[in-house]
Design a protein with these regions (language model features):
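Active-site clefts of carbohydrate-active enzymes
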Residues: 66-89
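Active-site-proximal helices and loops of the catalytic beta/alpha 8
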Residues: 1-67, 100, 117-147, 151, ...
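Short, well-ordered beta-to-alpha junction loops that form the rim of enzyme active sites
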Residues: 13-14, 75-78, 114-116
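Carbohydrate-interacting/catalytic domains
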Residues: 94, 105, 110, 114-235
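Conserved catalytic core of Hanks-type protein kinase domains
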Residues: 75-78, 103-104, 151
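Structural preference for beta-strand elements that scaffold enzyme active sites
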Residues: 8-10, 71-74, 108-109
């Protein structure tokens, strides 16, 4: 930082305590491979407890959590692993895994081509994983990810907020990101059926940062099938 304060240093790490490399004397951030596995596995096994466990371990409210206040590099695929569109068993989960990656603590990183759902498997080698594209494509997934990026960019809570689990089932999860100035609830429904969520929201209404629509918490919150929301709370 003393030599060039605006030069961001990030390291590629797999296992172990990331604090060994991510600290005031070394790197600003490292790749979050622990949550990479938890992200796709939670959808494929329909077990949101897995990714929630990792997020609580890394960023939860307890004093012992590993990386509270730090910003790991979040990703759902990269140049060394099977592309997420090829690893998910249900294509309806593709937008949702990005909503989870952008909503959780960390710096989301999108691998080129995956923003429109490019497919490739690790067993087919580097040429498949690192393909050349003639031009970018734009589809509904691209539009959705761009909305997630816009929401993340302008939200203090999504960038710097604490992490707290609010509601958790095998197929749904709601967690809170909170700073002194803003509170956002990230809600995911991975099921093919609507889900009525009952919890203490602490306020009456919110605005979904993805759609811009107002959400009323009165009488419960219905999550549509295969849906995600970033509810910015009224207080």
């Amino acid at each position: 930082d003393g030599l060039k304060p605006d030069f961001f240093l990030v390291g590629e790490t797999l296992h172990g305590d990331y604090n060994q490399w991510m600290n005031d004397s070394m790197l600003h951030s490292v790749t979050n491979y622990e949550c990479y596995k938890g992200l796709y596995s939670s959808f494929n096994s329909m077990n949101m407890f897995e990714i929630n466990h990792s997020l609580l371990r890394q960023f939860g409210p307890d004093n012992w959590t590993l990386y509270k206040g730090k910003h790991l590099l979040s990703f759902v695929d990269n140049h060394d692993v099977t592309r997420v569109a090829s690893i998910l068993s249900n294509e309806n989960h593709l937008p949702l895994i990005y909503a989870l990656a952008f909503g959780m603590p960390g710096i989301p990183c999108v691998y080129y081509g995956s923003e429109w759902g490019a497919k490739a498997k690790k067993e087919d080698g580097d040429p498949a994983l690192r393909a050349c594209f003639e031009k970018p494509e734009w589809n509904d997934l691209t539009t959705f990810i761009s909305k997630l990026a816009e929401a993340k960019k302008h939200s203090n809570a999504l960038n710097y907020g604490d992490f707290r689990s609010v509601l958790l089932t095998n197929r749904q999860c709601i967690f809170e990101r909170k700073t002194d100035s803003e509170r956002v609830l990230v809600a995911i429904n991975a099921d093919d059926q609507p889900f009525m969520a009952h919890f203490d929201a602490g306020c009456g209404t919110a605005v979904d940062l993805i759609t811009g629509e107002t959400h009323d918490f009165g009488g419960g919150s219905e999550l549509a099938p295969y849906s995600a929301a970033y509810w910015k709370m009224e207080r």
